[in-house]
Design a protein with these regions (language model features):
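Conserved small helical "lid"/interfacial subdomain of P-loop NTPases
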Residues: 146-173
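P-loop NTPase nucleotide-binding core
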Residues: 1-83
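Short regulatory helix/loop adjacent to the ATP-binding pocket of P-loop NTPases
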Residues: 123-141, 159
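Conserved beta-strand scaffold positions in the cores of enzyme catalytic domains, especially
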Residues: 1, 143-145
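Conserved nucleotide-binding/hydrolysis micro-motifs of P-loop NTPases
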Residues: 2-6, 91, 121-126, 149-152
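Conserved Walker B catalytic segment
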Residues: 54-122, 131
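Short glycine-/polar-rich loops that comprise or flank the Walker A/P-loop
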Residues: 112-114, 139-142
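Short, glycine/charged-enriched secondary-structure capping and boundary segments
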Residues: 11-14, 98-101, 131-135, 160
Length: 174
């Protein structure tokens, strides 16, 4: 999640929540569509699969603060507790908008049905965000530093079809 504004953050958070819900619970995906009223005109149904679709562009989010509020309202009404993991969380400190840390902290504090995982590659910024008394997220999370995963522990499974699909592999018959 390498975002540069609240609008991008809100868009990606909403998209990821929706795409995670869709295969798991049609009822909750529909509730999400009904809850996010500020961009509701961009939700629809795929006539072929008869599944809801999430077709929103970044420019469609005119008031990201309002849309973010709707997303957190949805999370608070979800039928099961949610785990929200945000990678590269330190990016919010670089947004041009003011007080984003305080805005998110307020939403997260009020969110009784969700648990949050904050991850970031810039350790000093993460440390400052959660350990400085002058910052909104002060003492709001347990800090855990993860070391790099050894290369031999990582396995990749990539099919030839997927490589062809992305253009990374060309097959020619001569």
């Amino acid at each position: 999640l390498h975002t540069s504004s609240l609008r991008e953050f809100t868009y990606l958070l909403g998209r990821e929540i929706y795409e995670t819900l869709l295969p798991r619970s049609r009822k909750m995906a529909t509730l999400f569509i009904q809850t996010i009223k500020s961009i509701s005109g961009k939700f629809g149904f795929d006539p072929i699969t008869n599944l809801p679709t999430f077709n929103v562009e970044l420019g469609d989010i005119e008031r990201p603060e309002y849309t973010l509020d709707e997303i957190f309202q949805y999370l608070s009404h979800a039928d099961k507790p949610c785990i929200v993991a945000i990678d590269e969380f330190q990016q919010i400190a670089k947004y041009p908008e003011k007080n984003i840390e305080a805005l998110l902290r307020t939403h997260i504090q009020r969110s009784e049905n969700s648990h949050f995982i904050f991850a970031g590659s810039e350790r000093h910024m993460m440390q400052e965000m959660f350990a400085s008394a002058a910052r909104p997220f002060y003492h709001s999370a347990d800090m855990l530093e993860l070391k790099a995963i050894p290369a031999e522990m990582i396995q990749f499974k990539v099919s030839a079809a997927k490589l062809q699909e992305t253009g990374a592999l060309e097959v020619s018959v001569e």
